[in-house]
């Protein structure tokens, strides 16, 4: 059992027969009354997200999640296809369940597939990935003074804020946990 106050982003637990993944968690202390935990959660099986609050002392059954090495093969319609690199088994995962992760991976990328018992529930991507800039505004001379950066669309469709000197066609290292630019590759 795990208390609501110990839940952090990325953890998975069971509640009312549902398998729930924490997307965001924060303590909130209102002016009057007790502390509450505000959370943004995702139902792992349906892919739906919702916001809720819990008392910090509420307890939940922590889900045991196993991972296996896999390779992203391709996406067709509403399904993403992955292959276990040890056994060569193929898995079909609804795109709604891995929509965010697909922004960080290209075909043939290495990932880890998450299992709850024998059920495939999601994908874990590496902490950093190398992606190519598909489109961005051209650099403007003297624009380095502000240092605010500019948006860039990467080859997967992900949009990140990058420094002004980045141009289309360059390879970048992206932090997948925060969705931010790290450096040029």
Curated annotation (Swiss-Prot):
Pathway it works in: Protein biosynthesis; polypeptide chain elongation
Q: Which Pfam families match?
A: EFP, EFP_N, Elong-fact-P_C
Asked if Protein biosynthesis is a keyword of the record, the answer is yes
Q: Where in the cell is it found?
A: Cytoplasm
Keyword Isomerase in the entry? The reply is no
Record-linked PROSITE patterns: EFP
Q: Which residues form a coiled coil?
A: none
Disulphide bonds annotated for this chain are: none
GO BP annotations of the record are: peptide biosynthetic process
Q: What InterPro entries does the record tag this protein with?
A: Elong-fact-P_C, NA-bd_OB-fold, Rib_uL2_dom2, Transl_elong_fac_P/YeiP, Transl_elong_KOW-like, Transl_elong_P/YeiP_cen, Transl_elong_P/YeiP_CS, Transl_elongation_fac_P
Q: What keywords would UniProt list here?
A: Cytoplasm, Elongation factor, Protein biosynthesis
Q: Which cellular components does GO assign to this protein?
A: cytoplasm
Which molecular function GO terms apply here? translation elongation factor activity
Superkingdom assignment = Bacteria
This chain's function reads:
Involved in peptide bond synthesis. Stimulates efficient translation and peptide-bond synthesis on native or reconstituted 70S ribosomes in vitro. Probably functions indirectly by altering the affinity of the ribosome for aminoacyl-tRNA, thus increasing their reactivity as acceptors for peptidyl transferase.
Sorted alphabetically, which HAMAP family does this protein's record hold? EF_P
Q: Which family does it belong to?
A: Belongs to the elongation factor P family.
For this entry, the protein name equals Elongation factor P
The protein's organism comes out as Streptococcus pyogenes serotype M28 (strain MGAS6180)
| Phylogenetic lineage | Bacteria, Bacillati, Bacillota, Bacilli, Lactobacillales
């Amino acid at each position: 059992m795990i208390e609501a106050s110990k839940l952090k982003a990325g953890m998975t637990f069971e509640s009312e027969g549902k398998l729930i993944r924490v997307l965001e968690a924060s303590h909130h202390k209102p002016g009057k009354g007790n502390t509450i935990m505000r959370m943004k959660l995702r139902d792992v099986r349906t892919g739906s997200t919702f916001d809720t609050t819990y008392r910090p002392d509420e307890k939940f059954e922590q889900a045991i999640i196993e991972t296996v090495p896999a390779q992203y093969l391709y996406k067709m319609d509403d399904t993403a296809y992955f292959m276990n690199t040890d056994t060569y088994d193929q898995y079909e995962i609804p795109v709604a369940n891995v929509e965010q992760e697909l922004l960080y991976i290209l075909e043939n990328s290495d990932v880890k597939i998450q299992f709850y018992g024998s059920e495939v529930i999601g994908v874990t991507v590496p902490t950093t990935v190398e992606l190519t800039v598909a489109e961005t505004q051209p650099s403007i001379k003297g624009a380095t003074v502000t240092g605010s950066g500019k948006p860039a669309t990467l080859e997967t469709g992900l949009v990140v804020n990058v420094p002004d000197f980045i141009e289309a066609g360059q390879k970048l290292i992206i932090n997948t946990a925060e969705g931010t630019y790290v450096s040029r590759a």
